[in-house]
Amino acid sequence: FIPSAYRSRIICIPRLCSSSITRSSMEVSGYCIRLLGIEFGYALYEAEITVEDVDPILAVENIRDYASVYVDGRLQGWITDNQKNIKLTVSTGTHHLQLYAENIGRITYGPEILDNSKGLFGSITLEDVEIENWKMTPLLIRDCDVEELQFTPCQTKQSPCFYRGTFEIETPTDIFLDTSGWGMGEVWINGQYIGSFWENISQRTIPVPAAILAKGINRVVVFELKNNCRQVVRLSEKAIFD
């Protein structure tokens, strides 16, 4: 089935959707997500940048674990612990920079367990000039009530967003949701959170227990961080691995 082309961009959530997804933003000089009072999930980092030369290099000193990079609402790419810099395809002038960071998990062994900070921390530079005056906002994606989200038609494919769709079944049974082709995010069925997906791992399906399914129409909400614009989700009778 294909989720309807109705999306709710994160930047519009406070106005369009449940306020439970965001907490108050804060101006910070440090960048760990624990400063926001959260230990897991997503955080949005925002700053105004001045570009003096086209295609500047954005670099971060430390990141755990992953962040999507947007400039003026357009996806530029991703930064990770293994790839800490990215060339921005932008013109000269003033632009709005957004970094959507996620804590994928926690280390449970080894020396790094003593300092397992998450988010972006240390210096963040544009062409070796440190970016200041950051605003951080916790995004309580997994804790939100997706049944309260208000969707509006949107044709552009830019910022991270929620998709919604429906499928129909005759008899509820244990099945799997195939997220092949999607980038990174979370899924709910009938308002119940069922799990996350990431294109970088071999698992392509999320188990769906019969207990949360209904005979007839069932509702699906997908949060997509990387916005691969896939828009197609399939049901499967078995787990799928690459």
Over which residues does each language-model region extend?
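Aromatic-lined ligand-binding clefts that engage carbohydrates, nucleic acids, or primary amines
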Residues: 55-70, 97, 167-190, 197-198, ...
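A short acidic/small-residue loop/turn micro-motif
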Residues: 77-84, 195-203
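Compositionally biased low-complexity segments at domain edges in trafficked proteins
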Residues: 127-170
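Short, surface-exposed tryptophan/glycine-enriched loops
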Residues: 85-96, 163, 168-170, 205-217
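Carbohydrate-binding surfaces of carbohydrate-active enzymes
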Residues: 1-133, 144-149, 225-227
